[in-house]
């Protein structure tokens, strides 16, 4: 039943990406149909409970952050590919986190932020904290603030509620394009 099938691209949904996501889905959908597979006409709205969404039996296609896939979804869904968002300094299909701070903060190295207030988007986020924790765990020994989104982490740093945050490089690019990164600087980039 095509009407019950769902598809989503929930990782990058700012207004600037809506058209690109729709075009990407149209290409995927058309390829699926050419290959004899049913596919919904349009993307489903991004749900508030992504874990339930990703486990929905009606799910045909979606994307997830790496940490939820490795930690909980790998036995429930099939990984069919990794998109290439052409992140600077990364091979095709890879990404990195950018560690940001206020531009007027005198600390200019990641080590100088130990311990400091760290904002992260979600406990199940590879880019929001896990990539940084795997690379330099000592820097995350200070207070932490879960913000609910990369955009909210950026805002927390801008407003001085947090001293630094790790932001997905693709999201950072979207936020820069939308003019939402004023007063911030990148102090570190994680390994791809």
Model-identified regions with their sequence ranges:
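Periplasmic-binding protein-like
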Residues: 6, 81, 89, 95-98, ...
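Alpha-to-beta junction loops
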Residues: 55-62, 116-118, 158-167
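Generic preference for hydrophobic
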Residues: 61, 79-80, 99, 118, ...
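Short, surface-exposed beta-edge/turn micro-motifs
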Residues: 56-59, 95-97, 115, 192
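Local beta-strand N-terminus motif with an aromatic residue
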Residues: 57-58, 77, 110-113, 141, ...
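Bilobed "Venus flytrap"/periplasmic-binding protein-like clamshell domains
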Residues: 7-27, 91-154
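N-terminal hydrophobic or amphipathic helices and topogenic motifs
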Residues: 1-76, 82-85, 92-94
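Pocket-lining segment of extracytoplasmic ligand-binding domains
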Residues: 124-192
């Amino acid at each position: 039943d095509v009407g019950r099938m769902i598809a989503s691209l929930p990782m990058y949904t700012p207004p600037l990406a809506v058209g690109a996501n729709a075009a990407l889905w149209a290409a995927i959908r058309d390829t699926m149909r050419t290959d004899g597979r049913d596919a919904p006409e349009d993307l489903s709205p991004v749900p508030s409970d992504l874990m339930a969404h990703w486990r929905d039996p009606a799910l045909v296609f979606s994307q997830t952050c790496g940490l939820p896939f490795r930690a909980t979804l790998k036995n429930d869904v099939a990984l069919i590919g990794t998109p290439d968002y052409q992140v600077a300094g990364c091979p095709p299909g890879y990404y990195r986190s950018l560690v940001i701070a206020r531009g007027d903060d005198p600390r200019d190295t990641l080590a100088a932020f130990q311990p400091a207030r760290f904002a992260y988007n979600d406990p199940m986020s590879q880019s929001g904290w896990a990539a940084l924790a795997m690379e330099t765990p000592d820097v995350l020994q200070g207070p932490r603030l879960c913000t609910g989104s990369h955009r909210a982490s950026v805002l927390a740093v801008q407003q001085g509620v947090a001293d630094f945050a790790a932001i997905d490089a693709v999201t950072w690019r979207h936020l820069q394009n939308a003019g939402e990164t004023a007063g911030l600087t990148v102090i570190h980039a994680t390994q791809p």
